[in-house]
A protein has these predicted regions:
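Leloir-type glycosyltransferase catalytic cores
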Residues: 36-79, 175-224
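Short, solvent-exposed loop/turn segments at secondary-structure junctions
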Residues: 10-12, 33-35, 87-91, 124-127, ...
Length: 224
C-alpha cells in the first residue's frame, strides 16, 4: 500500500480504479477531494503525476513510440494563416479563465505582431466529427502558417504533422517543442528532428494498455 491518491469520477472510472489496484493506491471520488488542500502526491486521469499534462521531458527509449507507428512529418512552411484551436471550456475554468475572454485577448495579442489572417477552429464536442469528418490535418493543410492554442492536444498533433505551434497554458504536453511567446508568431519554433523524436518517445511512455494499469507496470514506469 502506498500513499498515492487516485481520483475516480463517482468511483466508477475503470481505468483509474485498475491503476489504483495495480499500484496499491487509494481511490477517492473526484467530487470528494480537493487536491489543493492535500500534500499527498496524486494521479489525475491520463496518468500524469501532480499535473494536467506531461510538460517536462523525460529521456525514454523509443520502443513504445515505435509500436504506435505514428509518423513524424517534416516541417511544412509557406502557409499564410494563423489557426487558433479553441480549447475546451473545462480546463479554462480550472485555471480561472473565461474562454471567450482568452480567445479575444489572444487574437488581440497576435494582431500586435502580424497582419496575417487569423482563423478560429471551434472545438467540436463529438470526437468522431473532430477526427473523421472535420480533421485537424485538413485544417492545417489549408494554407496555415502555425497553430495557436491554450492546452488543446491539437498542438501535439500539429507538431507531429509538421506545423509549428504556440501553447499558452501553464502546462502542456507539447511545451518542449512549441513556443509560448506570441511575439515570435512570425518566426515560430522549429525544433530539430532529434528533439521531436525524443519528445514523442517521452509522450509514449505516458500511454498505457489496461493490462499495464492492472499489473503495476504503469505505476513502475511512472516512478522511474
Amino acid at each position: 500500500m502506498n500513499n498515492w491518491i487516485f481520483l475516480s469520477k463517482e468511483g466508477k472510472d475503470e481505468y483509474v480504479n485498475m491503476f489504483a489496484i495495480g499500484s496499491g493506491g487509494r481511490v477517492i471520488n473526484t467530487d470528494d477531494f480537493d487536491y489543493r488542500d492535500s500534500d499527498d502526491p496524486i494521479i489525475l486521469r491520463g496518468i500524469v503525476k501532480n499535473d494536467l499534462q506531461h510538460s517536462e521531458m523525460i529521456k525514454r527509449p523509443d520502443d513504445r513510440f515505435r509500436k504506435l507507428a505514428i509518423p513524424l512529418h517534416d516541417w511544412k512552411k509557406g502557409g499564410r494563416k494563423i489557426l487558433i484551436a479553441k480549447p475546451d471550456e473545462k480546463p479554462m475554468k480550472f485555471y480561472g479563465l473565461e474562454l471567450d475572454e482568452w480567445l479575444q485577448e489572444t487574437i488581440d495579442t497576435i494582431k500586435k505582431y502580424t497582419d496575417r489572417p487569423i482563423e478560429v477552429r471551434e472545438r467540436v464536442k463529438s470526437r468522431v466529427e473532430r477526427t473523421i469528418n472535420s480533421t485537424l490535418k485538413e485544417a492545417l493543410d489549408d494554407d496555415v502558417h502555425c497553430l495557436v492554442t491554450f492546452n488543446s492536444n491539437s498542438a501535439t498533433e500539429a507538431v507531429m504533422y509538421g506545423y509549428p505551434s504556440f501553447t499558452l497554458s501553464p502546462t502542456h504536453a507539447a511545451s518542449p517543442v512549441t513556443s509560448q511567446d506570441l511575439s515570435k508568431i512570425e518566426t515560430p519554433f522549429y525544433p530539430d528532428k532529434d528533439l521531436v523524436y525524443a519528445w514523442a518517445c517521452h509522450l509514449a511512455y505516458g500511454q498505457f494498455h489496461i493490462n499495464e494499469l492492472k499489473d503495476g507496470s504503469a505505476w513502475r514506469i511512472l516512478n522511474e
